[in-house]
């Protein structure tokens, strides 16, 4: 059997695989804010990014290693393809962290070998030990992944894993890269690795899975029963295509059904010892932070963290819950960080009260950012009687989200009505240049604003999504706007909130436009799609 740490290790890849969700690109400050909250959540490993992809990715991983990694904190990990250039960059990026890891990988399925790598099985068996050995020469904690293991020949997989462990890999990760397997198949795959890889006892066995068939969490739980002890997952299940296995669902499944899973860890069925180190009361806070910063809305019926996860509409259910919550609820909402207590701030609240509440919500702002957030808070408090946590999150997430600002919005004015053509006048400045003003007509006020902004910026794009939702209840609620722009097949999200939804739309559009421009100037590599040319004897 694989090495057993006595519990499940939670490997969070929100900042790497999760960020590959279309439109979910994050800037450095956003990544740092999420990493700090992941540390508070208690994850064991943070995969902070793919350092070789771009200078921005390298800087983000290095900054997280410096500020989040610690002697008692999470392991900071970076991803690297099986090439010395990637591995060296990864080692340099994570080096500031006392607890650090290189995660290197290569595909093992025949379809990937033939069509992506154009390599033979023999080539891969030559590359793996050399690259793992090189990584091990740089640090002691090395994870090796067999990309597309779910569609790989098990016999070949056993050979590759044995070679990787012999070369120094301390964690072996088995990805279901395209979400193809069923729970019984995935469980059998993990059981086979435990049974037929002779040196598997020298490494922790990990799993990584996508949700293309909606089976990622079920696959992982079956893998746990068969000896997997590290789960690679993301907050809210975000990720490419249908997403990754959801961290909050996995953690709570193990928490709620601990008596069922305990025997698979060699424990007494009634053992009260948690199966993971995650602080479950931080789950809702973490989910909201990731949703706010990525602009990816959590579906209302999402398990554990959805808005309706603890809501009851049926009269029979409501009656039962009022008499005893256990009649229809298997989880106490407080366990995941939900509380009936609402702490509301108002126009008389001071800077220290706002700072303290933001820290409780997971935001650690610099003095300058706090000054700006407090100014926005006071402005909102003049227009809105009661400021709730969701209002604060909307204010600060928009601020943290600001990318490198090529364009800055200076003015928005609109006129519209039943007998008027919707017309917008906007003023825009470009990198400290003079303001430029233009007016445009549209089918509605938001369309007019976007047309005017496009005229001024002159950056080709296609607006493919506009959504607005109320942050809180009441007629004075802030409107939270998400805009997604597309260019050359890539999506760029903008997110803003204001009591005036037209102003919020303009701010969100500029936010997305700045992301688009920044991305076009610094195109990162994709760890799976951008396959390096691998020789049997790669060199720097």
From Swiss-Prot:
GO annotation terms (biological process): L-leucine biosynthetic process
Keyword Transferase carried by entry: yes
Protein origin, superkingdom: Bacteria
Positions contributing to Mn(2+) binding: 17, 208, 210, 244
Record keywords: Amino-acid biosynthesis, Branched-chain amino acid biosynthesis, Cytoplasm, Leucine biosynthesis, Manganese, Metal-binding, Transferase
Cofactor list: Mn(2+)
Keyword RNA-binding on entry: no
Region (Regulatory domain): 408-540
Any single GO CC term annotated in Swiss-Prot or TrEMBL for this entry: cytoplasm
EC class name: transferase
EC number of this enzyme: 2.3.3.13
InterPro entries found in the cross-reference section: 2-IPM_HCS-like (IPR050073), 2-isopropylmalate_synth_dimer (IPR013709), AIPM/Hcit_synth_CS (IPR002034), Aldolase_TIM (IPR013785), LeuA/HCS_post-cat (IPR054691), LeuA_allosteric_dom_sf (IPR036230), LeuA_bact_synth (IPR005671), PYR_CT (IPR000891)
Pathway info: Amino-acid biosynthesis; L-leucine biosynthesis; L-leucine from 3-methyl-2-oxobutanoate: step 1/4
Pyruvate carboxyltransferase domain ranges (all copies): 8-273
Subcellular location field: Cytoplasm
Any one GO molecular function term: 2-isopropylmalate synthase activity
Catalytic activity: 3-methyl-2-oxobutanoate + acetyl-CoA + H2O = (2S)-2-isopropylmalate + CoA + H(+)
Family that this chain belongs to: Belongs to the alpha-IPM synthase/homocitrate synthase family. LeuA type 1 subfamily.
Quaternary structure and interacting proteins, as annotated: Homodimer.
Purpose: Catalyzes the condensation of the acetyl group of acetyl-CoA with 3-methyl-2-oxobutanoate (2-ketoisovalerate) to form 3-carboxy-3-hydroxy-4-methylpentanoate (2-isopropylmalate).
Protein name (Swiss-Prot/TrEMBL): 2-isopropylmalate synthase
Organism lineage string: Bacteria, Bacillati, Cyanobacteriota, Cyanophyceae, Synechococcales
């Amino acid at each position: 059997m694989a090495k057993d740490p006595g519990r499940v290790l939670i490997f969070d890849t929100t900042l790497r695989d999760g960020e590959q969700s279309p439109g979910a690109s994050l800037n450095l400050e956003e990544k740092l804010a999420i990493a700090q909250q992941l540390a508070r959540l208690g994850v064991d490993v943070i995969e902070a990014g793919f350092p070789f992809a771009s200078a921005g990715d390298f800087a983000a991983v290095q900054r997280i290693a410096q500020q989040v990694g610690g002697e008692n904190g999470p392991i900071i990990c970076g991803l690297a393809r099986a090439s010395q250039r990637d591995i060296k960059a990864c080692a340099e990026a994570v080096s500031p962290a006392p607890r650090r890891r290189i995660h290197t990988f290569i595909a093992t399925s025949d379809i990937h070998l033939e069509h992506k790598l154009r390599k033979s099985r023999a080539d891969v068996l030559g590359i793996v030990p050399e690259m793992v050995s090189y990584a091990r020469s740089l640090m002691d904690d090395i994870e090796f992944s067999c990309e597309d293991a779910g569609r790989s020949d098990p016999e070949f997989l056993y050979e590759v894993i044995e070679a990787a462990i012999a070369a120094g890999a301390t964690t072996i990760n088995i990805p279901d890269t395209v979400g193809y397997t069923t729970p019984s198949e995935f469980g059998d795959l993990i059981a086979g690795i435990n049974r037929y890889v002779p040196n598997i006892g020298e490494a922790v066995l990990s799993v990584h899975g996508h949700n293309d068939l909606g089976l990622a969490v079920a696959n992982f739980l079956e893998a746990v029963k068969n000896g997997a002890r590290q789960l690679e997952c993301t907050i809210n299940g975000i990720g490419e295509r249908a997403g990754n296995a959801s961290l909050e669902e996995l953690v709570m499944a193990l928490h709620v059904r601990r008596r069922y899973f305990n025997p698979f860890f060699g424990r007494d069925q009634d053992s009260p010892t948690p199966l993971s180190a995650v602080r479950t009361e931080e789950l809702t806070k973490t989910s909201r932070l990731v949703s706010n910063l990525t602009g990816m809305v959590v579906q209302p019926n999402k398990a554990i963290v959805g808005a309706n996860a603890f809501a009851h509409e049926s009269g029979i259910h409501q009656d039962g819950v009022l008499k005893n919550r256990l009649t229809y609820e298997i989880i106490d909402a407080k366990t995941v960080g939900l509380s009936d207590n609402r702490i509301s701030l108002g126009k008389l609240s001071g800077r220290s009260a706002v700072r303290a509440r933001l820290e409780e919500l997971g935001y650690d702002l610099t003095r300058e950012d706090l000054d700006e957030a407090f100014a926005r808070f006071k402005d909102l408090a003049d227009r809105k009687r009661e400021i709730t946590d969701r209002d604060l999150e909307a204010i600060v997430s928009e601020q943290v989200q600001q990318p490198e600002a090529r364009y800055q919005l200076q003015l928005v004015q609109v006129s519209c009505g039943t007998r008027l053509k919707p017309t917008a006048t906007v003023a825009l400045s470009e990198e400290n240049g003079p303001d430029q003003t233009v007016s445009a007509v549209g089918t509605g006020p938001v369309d007019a604003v976007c047309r005017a902004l496009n005229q001024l910026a002159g950056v080709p794009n296609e607006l493919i999504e506009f959504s607005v939702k109320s942050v809180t209840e009441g007629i004075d609620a802030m409107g939270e706007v998400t805009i997604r722009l597309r260019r050359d097949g890539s999506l760029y999200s903008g997110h803003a909130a204001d009591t005036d939804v037209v102003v919020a739309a303009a701010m969100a559009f500029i936010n997305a436009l700045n992301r688009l421009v920044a991305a076009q100037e610094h195109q990162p590599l994709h760890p799976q799609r951008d396959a390096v040319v691998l020789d049997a004897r790669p060199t720097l």
